[in-house]
């Protein structure tokens, strides 16, 4: 059953976000659980162990929001949810900066956990974002990983 009153919030922005404020916005009398995911800029690239100085994220305005909305609509069809917020930052980010916030509210915790995982897995592969990592030695585009593709296959079964 799809909840017609679900609160959906999608933002692409340069500025940081306040996890506490975004979580509070998901609170309502129908929700029994809220699950958040916060992605951060890591200091080391796990593939070549380069020490990262910064990461620059770019997106395709309009298309990015549309793709995120499609992902959210899929999650709404799969689970009974009461609210979803996706905030993704763009621009130059430094080590430990917040990149992405995914918050999901539901009547029941398992729905919130599953939907949050689903949304994040699909964001990693389907939302049009491009990343450039800058280290001491180089500046390079980040390629998609097979493990990210594998993560979405589990949801298609």
Give the location of each predicted region.
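Phosphate/diphosphate ligand-binding glycine-rich loop within oxidoreductases
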Residues: 102
């Amino acid at each position: 059953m799809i909840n017609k009153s679900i609160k959906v919030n999608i933002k692409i922005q340069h500025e940081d976000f306040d996890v506490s404020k975004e979580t509070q916005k998901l609170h309502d009398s129908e929700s029994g659980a809220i699950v958040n995911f916060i992605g951060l800029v890591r200091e080391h690239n796990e593939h070549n162990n380069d020490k990262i100085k910064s990461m620059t994220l770019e997106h395709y305005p309009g298309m990015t929001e549309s793709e995120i909305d499609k992902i959210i609509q899929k999650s709404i069809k799969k689970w009974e949810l009461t609210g979803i917020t996706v905030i993704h930052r763009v621009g130059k980010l430094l080590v430990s900066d917040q990149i992405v916030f995914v918050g999901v509210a539901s009547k029941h915790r398992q729905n919130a956990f599953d939907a949050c995982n689903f949304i994040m897995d699909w964001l990693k592969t389907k939302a049009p974002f491009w990343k450039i990592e800058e280290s001491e030695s180089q500046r390079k585009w980040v390629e998609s990983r097979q493990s990210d593709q594998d993560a979405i296959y589990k949801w298609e079964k």
